[in-house]
Amino acid sequence: FYGLREGSRSYFFNPDREDKPSSTKRIEKNGATVPFDGYLTDVFGQQAIEFLEDDSEKPFFLYLSFTAPHGPMHATEEDLERFKNITDKKRRTYAAMIWAMDRAIGKVLDSLDDSGRTENTIVWFLSDNGGATGNGSINRPLAGHKGIKFEGGIRVPFLMSWPERFPAGAIYDGLVSSMDIFATSLAAAGGNVTDAHLDGVDLLPFLTGKETGAPHQQLFWHKLWFSAMRDNNWKLIYVKDYGYALYNLANDREEKQNIAVEHPRRVDSMKEQMNIWKSMME
């Protein structure tokens, strides 16, 4: 293990602050607090490369969770210089942070390629949520932001690479979830997904065309005072003290038209299913 236990932290090491009691923000290596030299995104990438080089002959699982572009908004002067044409300071810093992460990922993939394991390695890339407010990110044309259940808060980039099985550049537009990563990886490794009682779905039959339906007919979200449900292209959002809104994403991806009044029976049906799901989570 190399990293921190929660959230994010400064991207630069400051010895005057590393002895603060917030141990979950310290950088650890296999349980021991360690200093680091350089920009944290670069450090995470280098640690991943060293892991790959140490186990170059063995099957492996690598979970590389960059803190970028989460706040605090820190970037190196060199990377900021690359985006000096962006006049908005927050947007410029955000772009520099994304650039640094992209560079680090590229180096990790180059290392994987150098070891000759690219063809039979599954690589997943995704974000945990949409862009936050006040940090220079832009979710347009989607509505909303991190923390709420409009598409701008929950629809994220989701890429998979497995050259031995799938050609590059293919697009799959079925309803999928980050929960599907484990189920798909388990199946790819020869595990039994059927009896595993997983929330996620093995995507391989859908990606190969053996299954023609959608991996999920329904998906649910809930956090604090926001809840949401997808039923195919229908989406119901609940906000505490506001009520329900209904959207048809097939023709309103931007969620501009609340059509709950026009479809009361659908709203009632989805409300009931959402409440049943929420009761199972308690």
Language model features with spans:
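Formylglycine-dependent
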Residues: 1-59, 66-75, 84
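C-terminal cap/loop subdomain of S1 sulfatases and analogous C-terminal strand-loop tails that border
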Residues: 4-9, 131-151, 166-170, 174-250, ...
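Flexible glycine/proline-enriched surface loops and loop-helix/loop-strand junctions
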Residues: 28-33, 86-90, 125, 139-143, ...
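Active-site rim elements
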Residues: 32-38, 91-95, 165-176, 189-195, ...
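A long, amphipathic alpha-helix that forms part
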Residues: 45-53, 80-121
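Loop/turn elements at helix/coil->beta-strand transitions in domains of secreted/extracellular proteins
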Residues: 56-62, 117-123, 155, 214-216, ...
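Beta-strand elements within well-structured catalytic alpha/beta cores of enzymes
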Residues: 60-65, 98, 105, 122-127, ...
